[in-house]
């Protein structure tokens, strides 16, 4: 319970913030403090209790939840391409930075690698997926679920190819999917 908190991760977070010249952040620190208990408990109950008790705002609760129960985890062995995909799915450079700093604290070392990952939104900005539903409709596909399926398959193909294809080649890929 709350009586036996392990402050190891919190201490690592303080070192990591300092090492990366990151301003102190209460939500990240709270996540580091709560992480051992939440991880052990495996539920959102403690998260809700603490959030209610501290009267956290909706956005603070969301940040805390994203740090403690991330949909996408960064791993130190991830390539730049894998990290870019997570950045793409998060679609939020601040959330990506939070997650990278949190993982760096959990790793508590390997600072150069994590610094490179944290800087990814600035050094390697992500392109916007260049096609939309109306592009699929313009190819003669009737409105409906098939449009979304084609978009999702094409986006996955684009991600697997490290965002390298432009609008023209993506539309050619959709045409190929339509023929198959």
Describe the function of each predicted region.
Residues 100-180:
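Charged substrate- and nucleic-acid-binding regions of tRNA-handling and nucleotidyl-transfer enzymes
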Residues 1-109:
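Conserved, hydrophobic alpha-helical core segments of structured domains
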């Amino acid at each position: 319970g709350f009586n036996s908190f392990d402050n190891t991760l919190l201490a690592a977070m303080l070192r990591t913030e300092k090492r990366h010249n990151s301003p102190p952040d209460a939500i990240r620190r709270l996540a580091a403090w709560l992480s051992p208990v939440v991880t052990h408990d495996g539920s959102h109950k403690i998260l809700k209790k603490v959030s209610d008790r501290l009267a956290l705002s909706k956005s603070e609760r969301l940040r805390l939840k994203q740090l403690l129960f991330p949909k996408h985890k960064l791993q130190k062995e991830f390539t730049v391409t894998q990290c870019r995909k997570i950045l793409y799915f998060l679609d939020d450079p601040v959330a990506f930075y939070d997650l990278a700093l949190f993982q760096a604290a959990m790793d508590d070392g390997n600072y150069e690698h994590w610094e490179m990952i944290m800087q990814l939104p600035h050094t390697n900005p992500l392109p916007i997926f260049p096609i939309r539903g109306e592009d699929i409709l313009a190819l003669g596909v009737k409105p409906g679920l098939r449009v979304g399926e084609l978009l999702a398959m094409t986006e996955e193909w684009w991600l697997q190819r490290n965002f390298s294809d432009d609008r023209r080649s993506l539309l050619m890929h959709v045409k190929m999917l339509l023929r198959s």
